[in-house]
Amino acid sequence: GSKEYQLCMDLVKYDVKMEIQKRYDALYGEDFWEQSYEGQYGYEILADHTVEKIKYIHAVYDLAKECGDVSDSSYEALEQRWKDENAERSEKVAKGEVIYGLKEYTFQLYLDYEISTLKEQYCNDLTREGMKLTEAEVLECYESRDWIFGGNEENADLETARVAVEREVREQKY
């Protein structure tokens, strides 16, 4: 609905603004969104990015529902989980119990947290589609760039980098 669209627009607005400023050397002013950038108005670019964000969020939640990680993939259910999480945290604070993380999540932070958790759940379950990797996939990713850990300037060998390489391949496939 319009509430979901507005939220997603708010999520992408800053990044879109920065992208337009950088790509078109544009200055941010009152008419920024009404300006034309190579034949497309700023508000159209913002709308396109908003729709892409909505599609991504729906894909994540539809997959999570399909896998049984959430029982309801709707925006309303997400909003309810956010409210429930904050109520639970507030109750613990009132009782003097220890809570980890924030006392209260903004909707955007909760969305980021939940998407990150769902992605991690999916990627860590090797029985899920695409998560069992071939040695060729791991090797291709490893050879695509340097793998440097800590203060060491040298490229790590595959066995040292394997966990990170496998995580990256799974996240790309996700």
Report each predicted region and the residues it spans.
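N-terminal targeting/tethering segments
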Residues: 1-107
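A short glycine/proline-enriched turn/edge-strand or helix-cap micro-motif
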Residues: 62, 114-129
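Buried hydrophobic packing residues in well-ordered domains
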Residues: 64, 118, 141-142, 165
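Intrinsically disordered, low-complexity, Lys/Arg-biased terminal tails
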Residues: 67-68, 100, 117, 125, ...
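Acidic/polar surface patches and capping/hinge elements
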Residues: 101, 124-158, 173
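Extracytoplasmic/luminal low-complexity segments enriched in Pro/Gly and acidic/polar residues
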Residues: 158-174
